[in-house]
Amino acid sequence: MDVKHIKDYLSWLYYQYLLITCSYVLEPWEQSIFNTLLLTIIAMVIYSSYIFIPIHVRLAVEFFSGIFGGQHESTVALMS
């Protein structure tokens, strides 16, 4: 790909970001606060998803395997 094409594409993405968030009407210091808050929220959502979703999926699998007659992990280990 051409470097100019990549630069144009990134500037187009940034323009779309400004239009979607309506942050083009903010002053520069307001934009920096808005961008900082947005990045902080996105980082917290990603971190929370990384930490808590696997735990909840494991608990849900254990719960539903118990309901539908699945064997517990310790029982399977003893039978092997």
Swiss-Prot record:
Localization, UniProt: Endoplasmic reticulum membrane
Side of membrane Cytoplasmic, spans: 1-11, 58-80
GO cellular component entries: endoplasmic reticulum membrane; serine palmitoyltransferase complex
Topology within the bilayer: Multi-pass membrane protein
UniProt pathway: Lipid metabolism; sphingolipid metabolism
Entry superkingdom: Eukaryota
TM stretches of this protein: 12-29, 37-57
Function text: Component of the serine palmitoyltransferase multisubunit enzyme (SPT) that catalyzes the initial and rate-limiting step in sphingolipid biosynthesis by condensing L-serine and activated acyl-CoA (most commonly palmitoyl-CoA) to form long-chain bases. The SPT complex is composed of SPTLC1, SPTLC2 or SPTLC3 and SPTSSA or SPTSSB. Within this complex, the heterodimer consisting of SPTLC1 and SPTLC2/SPTLC3 forms the catalytic core. Within the SPT complex, SPTSSB stimulates the catalytic activity and plays a role in substrate specificity.
Oligomeric and partner information: Component of the serine palmitoyltransferase (SPT) complex, which is composed of SPTLC1, SPTLC2 or SPTLC3 and SPTSSA or SPTSSB. The heterodimer consisting of SPTLC1 and SPTLC2/SPTLC3 forms the catalytic core of the enzyme, while SPTSSA or SPTSSB subunits determine substrate specificity. SPT also interacts with ORMDL proteins, especially ORMDL3, which negatively regulate SPT activity in the presence of ceramides.
Family according to the record: Belongs to the SPTSS family. SPTSSB subfamily.
Name under which the protein is recorded: Serine palmitoyltransferase small subunit B
Organism: Xenopus tropicalis
